[in-house]
């Protein structure tokens, strides 16, 4: 076993079909002895229609800032902007270094990164990209199987509930659409009569 523990947080937010990147998992690793992030293995649930998944990506998200020490965050910043006009569909390249990508994945996804760790807190995240024709009724379930550091399996501590189901969504408006920096969209409701 690897000597350092990897803390894992699975998101509970909608997967936007039109996005190239959607945060699926966050990873926080205090590299006291580990020097290399070798791979992360992920399993999709048996009910997942894998033909809807375009890509699964692993990103390096940087290190912990001194002012955040002790806050036990899972990300130093938001990796995908919700307010930068024209830049709300993909990871912000300044804060996201792509380490691995698997196109049209199978049920077991192996993200081989061989990424050199910095001493201290390192952040990684897994992104999910769906195909444009994916139905809004599609549901995704996934589970972390293992993380390897320096060729050894790491101890992983999950900081989120089990059996999370990720649902699809569409961003009705994005910053920059029709030349507008932002939009106010009133809440949409359905009555008992439809």
Predicted feature locations:
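Short coil-to-beta strand junction motifs in C2/discoidin
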Residues: 48-57, 139-140
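Beta-sheet-dominated interaction scaffolds and their linkers
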Residues: 1-35
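A short beta-strand element within beta-rich, extracytoplasmic domains
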Residues: 35-47
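Extracellular adhesion/glycan-binding regions together with long Ser/Thr-
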Residues: 69-120
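Beta-strand-rich interaction surfaces with strong enrichment in secreted/lumenal proteins
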Residues: 13-15, 26-27, 95-101, 111-116, ...
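Predominantly extracellular/luminal cell-surface or secreted proteins
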Residues: 43-45, 58-63, 125
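Asp-box/BNR beta-propeller blade signature and adjacent active/binding-site loops
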Residues: 21, 33-35, 97, 105-107, ...
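Short glycine/proline/serine/threonine-rich loop/turn segments at secondary-structure transition edges
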Residues: 118-120, 132-143
């Amino acid at each position: 076993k690897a000597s350092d523990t990897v803390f894992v947080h699975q998101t509970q937010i909608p997967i936007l079909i039109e996005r190239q990147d959607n945060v699926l998992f966050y990873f926080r690793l205090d590299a006291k002895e580990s020097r290399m992030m070798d791979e992360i293995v992920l399993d999709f649930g048996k009910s997942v229609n894998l033909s809807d998944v375009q890509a699964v990506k692993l990103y390096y998200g940087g290190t912990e800032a001194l002012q955040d020490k002790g806050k036990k965050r899972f990300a130093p910043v938001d990796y995908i902007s919700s307010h930068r006009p024209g830049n709300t569909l993909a990871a912000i390249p300044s804060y996201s270094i792509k380490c691995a990508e698997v196109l049209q994945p199978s049920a077991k996804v192996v993200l081989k990164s061989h990424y050199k760790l910095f001493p201290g807190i390192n952040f990684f995240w897994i992104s999910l990209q769906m195909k444009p024709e994916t139905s809004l009724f599609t549901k995704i379930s996934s589970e972390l199987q293992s993380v390897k550091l320096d060729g050894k399996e790491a101890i992983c501590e999950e900081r989120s509930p089990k059996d999370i189901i990720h649902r699809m969504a569409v961003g009705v408006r994005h910053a920059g659409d029709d030349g507008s920096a932002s939009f106010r969209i009133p809440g949409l409701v359905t009555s008992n009569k439809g």
